[in-house]
Amino acid sequence: MTKPTIDLQELRERIGQRAKSTPTHKFWGVYVHIVKRTTLEAAYLIAKRQNGAPGCDGETFARIEEAGRDEFLRDLATELCSGTYQPRPYRRREIPKGGGRVRTISIPAIRDRVVQGAIRLILEPIFEADFSDSSYGARPGRSAHQAIELVRQGLHQRKHRVVDVDLSRYFDCIRHDRILAKVGKRVQDKRILALVKQFLKSGGRRGIPQGSPLSPLLANLALNDLDHALDRGQGFLTYVRYLDDMVVLVPDSEKGRRWADRALERISEEAEAIGVSINTEKTRVLSMSEAGGKFVFLGFVWRWKRSPRTGRWYAYLSPRPEKVTEVLRRVRNSLDNSRHLRMRDAVEQVNGIVRGWANYFRVGNAAHALQKVKYHVERKVRRFAARKSKRGGFGWKRWSSEVVYGAWGLYGDYQVRYFNRAKVGVQPPGIINSL
């Protein structure tokens, strides 16, 4: 009798339920689900929606669609089933981080993006069952805003001694043998393990290639033991991690000081176990109750301030100045590369940059930063329009706000919206939204 087919969402739910109910279970025979047409097509649609840059082979989604998506997926499945599939080298791209530093992004070819995405679709429910509630980065139904709200709550619970941790080149330094061993604790399928190893090795001798669909899942898995170790102190402490960005909050008491020191020791031990070191120059234990006490987490500067209006103390978080500089630099570069475009098309590219930035940073105490960005973005767009019309200045009298935000369509929603605390809980994702 032929077994009835099940859709991908149901398959993922079944895998997750089995992983949750039997924490020691090792999954085997799941490679067959990766090479299924439904899995590969779902991974393809996710990759296409994200529309990343081409890999080293220059292949684009437009070319694949023109030649035939069915043939592309069929050839990929054939290679995977026959064992002839080989990942292509990553294309490296450097992204400025500010202060003269850069972050290296590894861009896989589209075919490799699809295969990695298919692996993630099948492995994700296995490891999601094991992951800690303290981990928020790149996980289904979780967000940076949820992590931010938990830190805010911790500060309002008077946990004012902060362990501010900086992991040195986290993604670049993770040992392959350690991450493969962690995958192997749950997955006993040699073909999957071999594929994961191939993807790691094609990125170099160490590290997890940033920019690949598999990297967030593996990065979370690498620190999962640390998450569970610190979770044992939850209640007295607050621990929140978003990929390699983490913070520990404890009461500013004698007991709290001991717990903070021990937490830092444990973080150092777990990081060393996977080949990563702590940046001792940037990692510190500080008191928010002392003058000048502040730390950085998820792009925000956190302070404990007293309201001049009510006299109450509260967690004050504002965007890092570097984040403001960075978004304005990106807008400038976009306009510099858009001189051949029509005004509305050039503005739409700017909107794609500032909309995401504003939606992320509009929580907390960001009113000043938001208005600063709005002013300078409008100024840059006006200057761009003046140059296109071969005029000087910024056209403050020539073009009204109705023209800039109406006819040109420049994004203008820079209002602060306080985070909805009722949504801190995890929201169930759909398949296409899971990567």
Language model: regions and residue ranges:
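Duplex nucleic acid-engaging cores and interfaces of nucleic-acid transaction enzymes
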Residues: 110-118, 144, 152
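A glycine-rich phosphate-binding loop feature that marks nucleotide/adenosyl-phosphate handling sites
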Residues: 242-245, 281-291, 349-353, 370-378, ...
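A conserved non-catalytic segment of reverse transcriptases
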Residues: 274-342, 353
